[in-house]
Amino acid sequence: MNHTKVIGAGLLCRGVVVAAALMISAIVPVEAQTIKVGLILTYSGSDAALGEQIDRAVNLFVKLHDSELPPGVKVELIRRDDTGINPDLAKRLAQELVLRDQVQILTGGQWTPNAMAVAALTKEGKVPFVTMTAGGSAVTLQSPYVVRTGWTLWQTSYPLGEWAAKQGWKNAYTVVSDFAPGHDGEAAFTKSFTEGGGAIVGSVRIPLKTTDYLPYFQKVKDANPDVVYVFNPGGPQATAFMKAFEDIGITKSKIRLIGPSDITYDQELPNMGRSALGVITLGQYSPSATRQANLDFVAAWQKEYGTDSVPTFFAVAGWNGMHAIYDAIKAQNGKIDPDATMKLLHGWSDPTSPGGPIHIDQAGDIVQNLYLRRVEENSGHLANIEFATIEQVGDPWKVFNKK
């Protein structure tokens, strides 16, 4: 066989194929370019309502902003259920999303233990990971491909300890759920409160699966501190904590209850009832805020999900996360390069987020306004009413542990 002729025949065939392809492309629209985004949240179990808040915010953002994507570009969300705090399952789901489903961006990150497991994978695989609500400071240290759009417990608890000390309260007790964010919150509040001249007279870490809180809270009552710093992961646990404080008589005593916004979770306030009245929290969002950006957000939310549905700070973290992802996609015209994506995300900003102006710093952490809120009756229902602002707070833990 004449080798030269075979090559020539191949070239001729390829020329015919190319010509045919060009003819077809002239009459058939170019196939849309799909960006696959893996979304790992809790869709089942006792904490599914928290995951639903994030998922609803993601859906709402996509519905309102899909038309802003470059022509021919679409986003496909591939959802996976981590069932709750389950780092092994979260890691496996992330591996499947990257290797089998070929996602180009990971997001979700509802729980710190799960987000830590997922983040560790992204370094080797070079997959951008936008964690939305994991509050442990260490999450963004696991990989240069991680940013967060929610908060950290150091961010919400260190300034709260400073504020508490300035109120003249001398003695504090800390009560936290026993996992990484609780440890962070305890450490942050303790540091700032004692730096301000206060003393920690007792502390307790409560296992996440505990349902009987009274033995723990009896110790708090016996210590009779001026103030109790409380952290739990929100949702139904927030109501269980508050009801236990009420049952043992702390909510009716002179002991003040304070904490990050998880402990008066907006969706749970109707279940807490009057036991939550007067509780002060520090957080990045309240649906009752009168900022125009928030009024617009709540209106869009309730148009989509009904007037009885209330967006929480979990929802806003999901909204911020999808906004950052969409902006990264638009900036690259739908061509996702991992390193270029991370360069865009570090420094990304939104001056009109529902919670106020935000940006992501070079450590991958969100910088945002924090609001002191008090549970009050508002138009016949309980609400977290903002009464003071601490502007543009980053993650203090990163500052204190800078190498």
Regions found by a protein language model. Name each.
Residues 9-10:
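Intrinsic, low-complexity polybasic segments
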